[in-house]
Amino acid sequence: MPKNSKVVKRDLDDDVIESVKDLLSNEDSVEDVSKKSELIVDVQEEKDTDAEDGSEVDDERPAWNSKLQYILAQVGFSVGLGNVWRFPYLCQKNGGGAYLLPYLILLLVIGIPLFFLELSVGQRIRRGSIGVWNYISPKLGGIGFASCVVCYFVALYYNVIIGWTLFYFSQSFQQPLPWDQCPLVKNASHTYIEPECEKSSATTYYWYREALAISSSISESGGLNWKMTGCLLAAWVMVCLAMIKGIQSSGKIMYFSSLFPYVVLICFLIRSLLLNGSIDGIRHMFTPKLEMMLEPKVWREAATQVFFALGLGFGGVIAFSSYNKRDNNCHFDAVLVSFINFFTSVLATLVVFAVLGFKANIVNEKCISQNSEMILKLLKTGNVSWDVIPRHINLSAVTAEDYHVVYDIIQKVKEEEFAVLHLKACQIEDELNKAVQGTGLAFIAFTEAMTHFPASPFWSVMFFLMLINLGLGSMFGTIEGIITPVVDTFKVRKEILTVICCLLAFCIGLMFVQRSGNYFVTMFDDYSATLPLLIVVILENIAVSFVYGIDKFLEDLTDMLGFAPSKYYYYMWKYISPLMLVTLLIASIVNMGLSPPGYNAWIKEKASEEFLSYPMWGMVVCFSLMVLAILPVPVVFVIRRCNLIDDSSGNLASVTYKRGRVLKEPVNLDGDDASLIHGKIPSEMSSPNFGKNIYRKQSGSPTLDTAPNGRYGIGYLMADMPDMPESDL
């Protein structure tokens, strides 16, 4: 692509220093703050004259008040609940400390390059996901629509999880915590412990019976759970109020929602390190099992976690970056946010396993105490001789080391009869190996551990407030991935669209607050996003590298950043990343095919979970979720390819922003202009002369070079303009 002669070639190190200074610069003058608050998009202010009334309209796009606000928004979107309850589980399951190496490798090979790609296209084209991919190629415009559909599917159930967290948060202001003990059941004759709770645990019972009031299968609706319905309504009201003014409102909230979780995690880490057993948990967590690095499953799960941890394919990354200045160093942002995400995951893993180590130590002490009593009974009845017990061991107050010595002795002496003695080894590692993830970690394992904390209500309030903020940060990015592209494309008022979007989502979300709602959350989590997002990101990579052209894209980046990106990205975007994404897609499809579609149902009579297969209608819903999410891609391609919709009426609308209002202004196009905008290749154009009205008035007089090899003419030419026009494609 033709280079902008005004570009200043800067040294990469100097550019990074500038970015850091910009990020840490918060002491702006009153005039600077006023200028930033004006939400000006272009370097030069553009003013257009309305054809009907001759009034001037400031063509402005909302922008971030500061670089710090933008970084916090990206961090808030990428750092979510998965960092707390998914990454630690994967780390423990896949080799402990050894898992970090494949994760880091894949972060460098897949994560950072693709994250940088999404930031770049959003910042350069200054549109949401629909407008960006329409600009690259109208035939690939369905990629943006697919991203919006996936975002909406995810938002539907993700906010339900925030609703659950709100419920636990509201119940945490009690001493003792309501899930501390099993409830008692009274009848006319006597009082006894609730059988379902006695068979499981107090926290498990509270989660399934008190919070979810869960049914025994997905086919048993059981009606609405009114407590959770109210919490879901509160969650959607919070999201709606935060998003109703776009980044003007959500950006300010990000200062708290993005930073508060780090305060809580650090407090939890310091407190848990002072508890018995926490070091055992951390040691168990990070003890590397190097042999597991050779297993393909470990690499597949690491790649999947990298992919979803950064929010690739959702459109939120593109939407947030579209509000940046054009010369913002998005490469610095990509590296910074990616490593903040990684170190947050490691910090959360330290906290989780320090707390679980403390919990395992308590469980282990109970196990030793109970089994020591059993050994004393065996000694008193003569089943085991006192002579085999070392004299220095006191079974009334036995330590873990002494118990294991006695256990090993009895196992050798009573080798044939040992099984009938029902003694347990009571190893703390056995408890730590019972890895849990997701809601099981947050609402069962972690809540149980916190009941043993001094001042447990305080820590419970802090923990669930942290989860609420983590969830809301991700929700803001997800909703922005829906709102921004739709506003850019269909010219609707952002406030009205936000309210309608949230209201409709709440109504659909009522299916998740039935007594069987937890099973629908599992269904949507398993099938609505994984494969569709992989396909979306593969198509994004292909669109930039092969349709638009990797060389032209790198020239755009050089013009935009002021320095040439490393050749590393050329090879990643053109060869390595597409190959690895396709491999990951195939591996995910194979894994999905080998795993029977089903869910873990809570069986009241057994007080335990049991795997059940989905009924036939459930299978249809699972398949429909995947198809609906990716359907816009072929539909838009066929419509554009076959010209089923006439775009060349000569009256397109371009969106402008003024004082928070979205205005429509007609742009009359000559025939040649329309053919350019609608993506016709040069051979299909009726005239080589460009029309007069394609571009709005520019502040300079840039030189246009034609692209003899450009496939989509207008996409090539528009990117050369210092102040790129707002494309409606």
From Swiss-Prot:
Lipid bilayer topology: Multi-pass membrane protein
Question: What GO biological process terms are annotated to this protein in UniProt?
Answer: L-leucine transport; neurotransmitter transport; neutral amino acid transport; proline transport; sodium ion transmembrane transport
Question: Which family, according to the similarity comment?
Answer: Belongs to the sodium:neurotransmitter symporter (SNF) (TC 2.A.22) family. SLC6A15 subfamily.
Per the record, ranges on the Cytoplasmic side are 1-69, 643-729
Q: Does the keyword Glycoprotein apply?
A: yes
> Which Gene Ontology cellular-component terms appear in the entry?
membrane; plasma membrane
Q: Which residues carry this modification: Phosphoserine?
A: S25, S55, S687, S699, S701
Keywords noted in UniProt: Amino-acid transport, Glycoprotein, Ion transport, Membrane, Neurotransmitter transport, Phosphoprotein, Sodium, Sodium transport, Symport, Transmembrane, Transmembrane helix, Transport
TM ranges are: 70-90, 98-117, 142-162, 226-244, 253-270, 306-323, 335-356, 453-472, 496-514, 530-550, 571-592, 620-642
Q: What is this protein called?
A: Sodium-dependent neutral amino acid transporter B(0)AT2
Which residues does the record list as glycosylated? N187, N383, N394
As for subcellular location, the record says: Membrane
| Zinc among keywords | no
